[in-house]
Amino acid sequence: MQKIFFIADTHFGHNNILNFSNRPFCSIEEHDECLIDNINAHVGKTDILYHLGDFCWGDTAKKQIDFAKELINKINCKYIHLVLGNHDPRTNSGQPKEDFIKLFNSCSPYMVVRIPNTPSVADIGHTKKKKTVLCHYALRTWEGMHGGSQGGNGSLGGDYGTNLPSGL
């Protein structure tokens, strides 16, 4: 059965993230290898992985895109959807770089997806799909939140309602 996973803020290749986020690694290479190993240990080839932004780092957009290709080739999962974060490559006008977004099955700053078999009081006895709103940034409100939808975010976690934890 196909499973759905969420992860955010991997910051592959971002040396400073080790200090900024107190990540317990001696080097960014060790960090990146551990994250890829953890993803591959939990997420199967046909599962779906939603990445909630800040995928990887590069000194230039070209280096970042080339590095992203290299990383995606190491991840076993073939269904990776990206919700854009503030460190994902963009053009001077703020639009996502075309070569970058092509690497993912879908790519958007905001996604509304339906997650099957998510439990809620209203779902007992039913196999419904729950509306789930995904954004890199914590949203104070989101589409359908008063009707039982859930929100998931990366960067700025907070207790604003029913938020999904992201991470493997």
Regions found by a protein language model. Name each.
Residues 1-2, 129:
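A structure-centric signal for secondary-structure junctions around beta-strands
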